[in-house]
Amino acid sequence: MSAIKQVVTPISVERDLLGDFVHVVEEAAIASTRTMGQGDPKASDQAAVHAMRQAFEGIHMAGNIVIGEGERDKAPMLYIGEAVGAKPPDGVEYPRVDIAVDPLEGTNLCARGTPNSICVLAASEPGGLLHAPDCYMQKIIAGPACRDALDIDAPVKYNLKAIAHCLDRHVKDLVIIVLDRPRHEELIAQIRAAGARIRLIEDGDLSAGIAAAVRGAGVHAVFGTGGAPEGVLTAAALRCFSGEMVARLVVNTKELEERVERMGISDAKRVYTARDLAPGNQIIFAACGVTDGALLHGVRFFGDGCRTHTLAMTYQSRQVRFVDTVHMFREPGNRGVRLY
């Protein structure tokens, strides 16, 4: 007779795992910050990956990496399809959770000590995050005011006018974030010709997408082509505070077509919204600053520990938290804890 398996009481992803996932990104950020400014992006990424993978092992869940460091044969850990979470006792099954990770967004930024490097994850119930291939994705990202106003097939000038109208501004008032890449030369020229201003960034279109959808960040939209995995993570964040996004995979080779089909995507030319990319009913998004940025402070070390700054958001419960944490590596002694 086969053993009867006991399934742990169903969990609320948002209620029961938010604190655990905040801890995961904090551990990755602390580890990668130790490599900041050392000029070795690979070492920075490896530090974040190892710390994140180890932190997952303490969580009572059957986690499934749906977006990670690459295919199984190309990544030693946090690869697509890897199972993460604590090993359950015999006869017990932990609840299943889909997880998307970018252990260190902006590896070059961390290696150079420049702003906006972050450690990121998103999680949902199974099926709540698109299994996106590791390819490029065309994106336009803006705030909640631009709901249903963006058209990825329309000219750049049309979308700029639409964004300006939604924000009650002139096009010349807008600041658009674009990745500084040769492939964006024509896009940059069109934005300038329309009269909008541009903020070029070296890396980090995920953090840029979040900033563009938040009021008071000084930017109004993101245009251009970046990574598809980062697009799904951005969509998870946007779902939590109703940001707007339209996107489409860039599938321009036979190899990519086959990879997209293997991942269950039947229409490679489909235009996605944030809801399409992150359709879950329960979504967690967590990001911890590595270097200082527009939204998050980087990790700050002191003699007996460090301080982290984390953005933690949930979709169903509609919560956006900025978590300021002091980590004490040992007894603080006579120093105590500094508030600011």
Model regions: which residues?
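DPxDG-like acidic metal-binding loop motif
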Residues: Y94-E105, L109-L130
